Amino acid sequence: METLYNGTLTLGGKDQESTGFAWWAGNARLINLSGRLLGAHVAHAGLIVFWAGAMNLFEVAHFVPEKPMYEQGLILLPHLATLGYGVGPGGEIIDTFPYFVSGVLHLISSAVLGFGGVYHSLIGPETLEETFPFFGYVWKDKNKMTNILGAHLIILGIGAWLLVWKALYFGGVYDTWAPGGGDVRIITNPTTNPSVIFGYLLKSPFGGDGWIVSVDNMEDIIGGHIYIGTINILGGLWHVFTQPWAWTRRAFVWSGEAYLSYSLAAISVMGFVACCMSWFNNTAYPSEFYGPTGPEASQSQAFTFLVRDQRLGANVASAQGPTGLGKYLMRSPTGEIIFGGETMRFWDFRGPWLEPLRGPNGLDLNKLKNDIQPWQERRAAEYMTHAPLGSLNSVGGVATEINATNFVSPRSWLATSHFCLGFFFFVAHLWHAGRARAAAAGFEKGIDRFNEPTLSLRPLD
């Protein structure tokens, strides 16, 4: 009897007998069929772009301009808004037509990719080496593999430069730090000082250092893309025009599964970095679109109650809380004036709504008494009730469920999904790296079990 698992099932003319892989091994059946593998990749790209376009239009159709983006479960429109499309002062969405255009362009692109995927999967040549040698390859051809690596790096570099051109010449990008509560602006002076850009890479990832996640201005972000785009393009050209050195030929495993494992490791790292960026960073991920960070929501609550009680006559500089520490304000271990209460743990938070109230030694008491602007109060009150937490209780000094809004923050979605995906990709890297190394060593089929003692034991029944 034929089942899905006995190896006799044939899908697309590829069965376990002819390929060495069962149907559920997917593209492994196409390892040596470059034309069919091209079809799988193009079709996969079509699915990705189709999702982007369809989800984009879905978000546009459900978008309510009167509510904050982060309260509506949106994850794509915030990215478009961050690029400066359809946004006005203070992060207000004034035009959704660019978002509609983006969705339609992605859908049209996905149709082209989908057609290409179907064509190369079913109609085009099974292998490209004979008919299109430029696009053909053999996995063990080290020079060809580094040529392909170089082409990918060049395309990534161009992608980084597209953001630079958008920021410098094509309308600018949204800057949450623009005076008055954020605005779209042209980045006229991107950071090109290598000590600043590479200084982020040399920072500790812990505490207040934060590695590259600590970037806090658009000049550094765009300058970083100038560097990474240029390095990618130059590195791509290097890999296209050179051949691997002897030590790299010896050090790496040169097979399709090995390249898959390397790619999975790289995308795993990107997933973990994206997790941290989307959770902690409020410059690359402006809070106007993604909602406040955890520390930001906590500091917002302290600020909101300071404003309220100060209006009611409280002396916010000297009032004590139940622990004897300052109720509204206190000093950090280094002597800076910070917010008191549970939010003291987030004393090093930086946000565009709070920074104007700082002085040379932390929060400026005179500014807190005389210079608080209405937009700062409104934003803090909004952020206070939109902490990116799943907890219904007061955690870290943020609003309890009585005061909070019942929603899931885009930061929660993005950080959690990218952490999980990053983890799974890392496990997949270990799996495929182990298989690739085993195959290179000649024992990928596992240990011979013919003499396994278990096989000679009497059956239990």
UniProtKB/Swiss-Prot annotation:
Q: Which cellular compartments is it found in?
A: Plastid, Chloroplast thylakoid membrane
Predominant location: plastid
Q: Which residues form the signal peptide?
A: none
Q: Which UniProt keywords apply?
A: Acetylation, Chlorophyll, Chloroplast, Chromophore, Manganese, Membrane, Metal-binding, Phosphoprotein, Photosynthesis, Photosystem II, Plastid, Thylakoid, Transmembrane, Transmembrane helix
Q: What InterPro entries has UniProt attached to this entry?
A: PS_antenna-like, PS_II_antenna-like_sf, PSII_PsbC, PSII_PsbC_sf
Source species, domain of life: Eukaryota
Q: Which residues form the propeptide?
A: 1-2
Where do the TM regions start and end? 57-81, 122-143, 166-188, 243-263, 279-300, 435-459
The keyword Cytoplasm belongs to this UniProt entry's keyword annotation: no
**Which Gene Ontology biological process is one annotated for this entry?**
photosynthetic electron transport in photosystem II
Membrane topology field: Multi-pass membrane protein
The molecular function terms in GO held by this entry are: chlorophyll binding; electron transporter, transferring electrons within the cyclic electron transport pathway of photosynthesis activity; metal ion binding
Which protein family is it in? Answer: Belongs to the PsbB/PsbC family. PsbC subfamily.
What is the protein name stated in its UniProt record? Answer: Photosystem II CP43 reaction center protein
